[in-house]
Amino acid sequence: MNAVKHLLPQVPQYFKANLHTHSTISDGKLTPEEVKEGYKALGYQILCLTDHNTIVNHSDMNEPDFLMLTGIEININAPDMTKVGSKTYHMILIAKEPDNLWCPAKLHRWFPINEEYERKTQYGDLVLQYSPDSINNMIAKANEKGFLVMYNHPTWSCQTYPDYAGLKGLWGMELRNTECCMIGHDENNFRVYRDLLNQGNRVYPLGTDDMHNRRSLGKSWIMVGAPELSYGSVIEALKKGDFYMSCGPEIMDLWIEGGKLKVICSDAKRINLETHGRIARNVIAKDNNWLREAEVDLTDFIDKVKED
């Protein structure tokens, strides 16, 4: 009998989540309550409000069928940030505990500061500069302080290989940020993601919409396979990579059996398997039909299946 290795958790329900969102607390156009209602209307169950350089616990907005995560987007700009095409690091920190309001330093904000949020924030004393060493120091400190660290939209940030090649300790990276194409650059970051993987990093791929206004709602997301909709359960699933990203298709099951990768999904025209090299496998729907399942033989180009 061939052993079966499931690549997605076998749980009763997956929860739709967005982990990169802005409100009127920073430079968004909608209040936190309006943001939540917008996502809830689209079938989301998890939302992380990640306002710029400002961290807030939104647990008071939780409902039995909707969970708010605590997070912040950190911006570290190059000295020439006023110029077109200048570089910037944007990193999201997602707190493993809802009341963890640590922030690495007091950073520049170009919007009104809420004094109540300011009093509750636990500021660190890091000196943040635009350099890989400085960012790595922040990532290490954020991991130590109980956060998951996500690297945001490097293509939109005009970053190149030397800016990200040495980054260590990342939990995730935006493979797709659908707001970027609306404000001046490519929404996809596939090349950067492959570079990080090829260096031996385990970094999970994220889909987000980086919502600042209603036009951005619901363009890209992740589906989280957690046993229940609680803060601890969702964070544990995120830590382990028990989720997948999507801009539309749903994956019902994904597993390896008998040297073959098998998938069951919602309607798709094409299913691709890409690898770290120049080898791929494609299954394409025929005669204007839809694909709802596929299998790909792995024996020619996968040496082994990792167990961890």
Specify the residue positions occupied by each region the protein language model found:
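A metal-dependent hydrolase metal-coordination microenvironment
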Residues: 2-148, 152, 159-161, 166-168, ...
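Alpha-helical membrane segments in multi-pass integral membrane proteins
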Residues: 170-172, 296
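Short, hydrophobic/aliphatic alpha-helical segments
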Residues: 188-202
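C-terminal functional module detector
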Residues: 1-10, 14, 200-204, 209-308
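Short, well-ordered alpha-helical segments in soluble proteins
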Residues: 174-180, 197-200, 242-245
